[in-house]
Amino acid sequence: MSKYTPSLKKHYAEVVVPELRKSRGYKNDHQIPKIVKVVLNTGIDSEADKNAIADVQRDMNAIAGQKTVLAKSKKAIANFKLRKGQIVGCHVTLRGDNMWEFLYRLIAVALPTIRDFRGIATKLDGQGNYNLGIADHTIFPEISLEGVKKHIGLDLTIVTSAETDDEGRELLRLLGMPFRRSSETPKPATAA
């Protein structure tokens, strides 16, 4: 009986690693950048009731494929009407096969369903990691539109072992991340 291997993980081992080794001239396998983890995060309205919190957590569990952790405020901030210990969001860290399956669903299914999608920004954080904001969680196939009471946004962080942005960008590009071409960069609005 053979062990199941996610298709994107197989693609990484069979296509991406040899391509990176050839293009970058890595001599050691440990030099080749890899995806370490994927972190999903969302905020919850501080005045949300328990049912709304449960709905957000249910949707995040479905998207991630594993249980999320509720984030609580560490201190009270009167201007934001925030009490210490109040639930302010939830997050989940994906590693291993869950991470590879999620990335495959993100790249192949979720991102292409965005209306007028022209690719995602190519900017990384300076250390080879990629951050992506998703405005509406209903782009994921695990979420049925009938059960959604409120649309939520997600923050997505892909942490890589790449030492530079160029290495991280090349790794993600070879994995199939649909980056925007440099000629399609949106122009800043000008004052009229």
Describe the residue ranges of each PLM region.
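Ribosome-associated RNA-binding proteins
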Residues: 1-192
